[in-house]
């Protein structure tokens, strides 16, 4: 009889250990976000974006121009809008963005990070898990490698001649 109580205690402990996880539930709270203003700053390569989200109809203003005018490429439009699409908040926020520095891809990445940080600031409990799991809250630290002396480019060396 003592063996049975010991076995049940071991089973309960195993269940507790297997059910424990350090990961947050990414599905928790999606779609239940609060509609309030938020602000976020994003950086990518040499680009810096300051993003303000205000409750609205889904209108984008980037340096005084619309999203389609500023980023004619659909790929970049999708990248910029991806945090809002992930949280199913299309048409609920107007975005006012000031971005400078870098090229188009760097600016799009900076805006995406700024939008994700603004959404995180608006409702941390509902939005953070999904944004974190998708990787939208992580700053992309890749930058161009500097040119070294004695080389043509960062790593391209002059042609080697044995004789």
Curated annotation (Swiss-Prot):
**Cross-referenced Pfam families, in alphabetical order?**
Ribosomal_S9 (PF00380)
Family, as annotated: Belongs to the universal ribosomal protein uS9 family.
Signal peptide (from-to): none
Query: Which keywords does this Swiss-Prot/TrEMBL entry list?
Result: Ribonucleoprotein, Ribosomal protein
Alphabetized InterPro entries for the sequence:
Ribosomal_Su5_D2-typ_SF (IPR020568), Ribosomal_uS9 (IPR000754), Ribosomal_uS9_bac/plastid (IPR023035), Ribosomal_uS9_CS (IPR020574), Ribsml_uS5_D2-typ_fold_subgr (IPR014721)
Which chain positions lie within coiled-coil regions? none
Q: Per its UniProt record, what PROSITE patterns does this chain match?
A: RIBOSOMAL_S9
The identity of this protein, by name, is: Small ribosomal subunit protein uS9
């Amino acid at each position: 009889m003592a063996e049975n109580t010991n076995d049940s205690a071991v089973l309960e402990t195993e269940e507790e250990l297997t059910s424990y996880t350090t990961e947050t539930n990414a599905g928790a709270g999606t779609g239940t976000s609060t509609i309030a203003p938020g602000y976020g700053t994003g950086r990518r390569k040499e680009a810096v974006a300051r993003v303000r989200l205000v409750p609205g109809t889904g209108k984008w203003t980037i340096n005084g121009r619309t999203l389609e005018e500023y980023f004619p490429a659909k790929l970049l439009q999708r990248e910029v809008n991806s945090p809002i699409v992930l949280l199913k908040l299309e048409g609920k926020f107007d975005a006012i963005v000031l971005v400078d520095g870098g090229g188009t891809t760097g600016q799009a990445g900076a805006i995406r990070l700024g939008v994700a940080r603004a959404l995180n600031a608006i409702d941390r409990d509902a939005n953070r898990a999904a944004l974190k799991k998708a990787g939208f809250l992580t700053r992309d630290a890749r930058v161009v490698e500097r040119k070294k002396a004695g080389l043509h480019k960062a790593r391209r060396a002059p042609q080697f001649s044995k004789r």
